[in-house]
Amino acid sequence: MSQLPLASQATTTDLVSTTAMQPQSEGIVDESLQPQHPPSSTAHDSPCLQDSVPLVPPPPSPYLNKEVGQMVCGSCRILLAYFRGAGYVHCTCCQTMNYVLEAHEVGKVHCGHCATLLMYPFGAPAVKCSLCLFVTEIGERNVRRRLSIEQPTRTNSSGLAEA
């Protein structure tokens, strides 16, 4: 088996230069040096499939157009900012994981001593003011009513209550 001259041997592993390289000696023809996939005559006649596919914009980033909420850390009382919809907020000062309450889970009452507006989770019996440390009892007027009590009962024409 004859060897190719050094000038015709590939010195790089580039696929394009390897397939396009032709031997310099006239009598040697190597089939492995030919292009692997010649262009098809039907490839130019068929329409491009990408043109027929409707382009859909990528979904927005989960952090764009998000509302930012604020809460006070339950341990060190520092103000924390978080994206709305988060279940927990991590305080970087004291490493506490704070549970985030939604608006419908929070009650509001004024402090019985300094009249500061206080927020508390529904069901709490009392709230301690962070300014004057006074404990305000959550009375019956501040307890969230049940849904069945909030909805008035309707009566039909025969005098029976409807659900």
From Swiss-Prot:
Principal location listed in the UniProt entry: nucleus
Disordered: annotated span: 1-51
Composition bias type Polar residues, residue spans: 1-25, 33-44
Keywords: Nucleus, Plant defense
The UniProt record lists the keyword Nucleus: yes
Single Gene Ontology BP annotation: positive regulation of growth
Lineage top rank: taxon: Eukaryota
Region (Putative zinc finger 1) location: 70-100
Pfam families: zf-LSD1
Subcellular location(s) per record: Nucleus
Gene Ontology, cellular component aspect: nucleus
Keyword Nucleus: yes
Region named Putative zinc finger 2: 108-138
Function: Involved in plant growth and disease resistance.
Miscellaneous remark of the record: Plants silencing LOL2 display a dwarf phenotype, decreased content of gibberellin GA1, reduced expression of KS1 involved in gibberellin biosynthesis and reduced resistance to bacterial blight. Plants overexpressing LOL2 show constitutive expression of PR1 and enhanced resistance to bacterial blight.
Name of this protein: Protein LOL5
